[in-house]
């Protein structure tokens, strides 16, 4: 029996049998024997460095040929650095990137024998690699006796390679599309998207037309006495008369104008008219085109009260401002302002209950100066004249004498050769007193003072040099 199993080929496995060891079996049996050097016991899994090959080339190196998209390999640990634990997972076309957390593999319930890590192949170079469907589950032993550093051991890991099929996603999408498709009443009729869009567009147009037609009909459906309106009559506004210009005098309508508008009916409004039709109650009525209305004896007074309000000033709205503007000189405006200010603005207290107090007239000179723009009187003169300051000022004389005495005493104590500074001091004060106290004069005075200080400093330096020598 053992001899028959020994000669049995891997390709001739019975239908239904597959090489699918569990995670615990991969570590406790296959990985343990490979690390300890028992290669003959694990010939079903080939040893290969996955970083030297691309993922789409690895399925051809599998010992067991299978139609399933899963392949197992022993992979030696390729350290990226000799003294580190980081592995080199880069290939020519891309790199393997670890994702997620390491999952523990237990033997029983508590004994941890290894970990499983997920790697995803990215085409290109980090960090701009493109994720692919090639995935590896890396199985690593965590027990101390399988560290791979003991005598007779070699560090290995088991890599389970598999590829996610894109067809699965396509089938799921097709199923979702079938669910989302709307129900059709007749399964034999096929309607394309273009036809549906055309139907929707035509329905929108019809609804729009119906809305427009309803606007035309809605105004006529409740009227029995008026003629039917058409769309052209509703839209055409050209029959409206043009608005006349308002450049004319406004006035209350005269009785003649009211009579021309009302015709013969106006005669019935007069108190002495005999065109009223009486009834048993001695009430008067007037016949108009809209029926009969009761009228009062003093209907004319009532019309006057409507056409002209008693509270309004009859002269207030007599004229309307004509179109355009006239250019008026400033002098004329000032004259108008003076005239307007002198007018008494008193109103009829009995009508409005408000009395407006008149404003006092302003002097003509001030008005003229205010109207004239850009002339001198509107400007403020900030410059002052200090011509009265001269050398006869006692304060300047005292300052001059004090400065002369101070400089003279210091020079006499140091050296008699420096007496010429007195002349310099006098020259400086002459310049200062001759300069007017203006902005430019102050600047020139500052310059002279600086020159004076520089001369004093130079004389002091010369004196010290002569004293040292």
Curated annotation (Swiss-Prot):
The family database entries (InterPro entries) matched by this protein are listed as: NAC-dom (IPR003441), NAC_dom_sf (IPR036093)
Q: Which residues cross the membrane?
A: 441-461
Molecular function via GO: DNA-binding transcription factor activity; transcription cis-regulatory region binding
> Where in the body, by tissue, does this protein show up?
Expressed in roots, rosette leaves, cauline leaves and stems.
Location within or outside the cell? Cell membrane; Nucleus
* Record domain NAC: where: 13-164
**Induction remark:** By salt, drought stress, abscisic acid (ABA), salicylic acid (SA) and methyl methanesulfonate (MMS) treatment.
Query: Domain comment text?
Result: The NAC domain includes a DNA binding domain and a dimerization domain.
Q: What else is known?
A: Plants over-expressing NTL6 show enhanced drought resistance.
What does this gene product do? Answer: Transcriptional activator activated by proteolytic cleavage through regulated intramembrane proteolysis (RIP). Transcriptional activator involved in response to cold stress. Mediates induction of pathogenesis-related (PR) genes independently of salicylic signaling in response to cold. Binds directly to the PR gene promoters and enhances plant resistance to pathogen infection, incorporating cold signals into pathogen resistance responses. Plays a regulatory role in abscisic acid (ABA)-mediated drought-resistance response.
What name goes with this protein? NAC domain-containing protein 62
The major lineage groups are: Eukaryota, Viridiplantae, Streptophyta, Embryophyta, Tracheophyta
Gene (name only)? NAC062
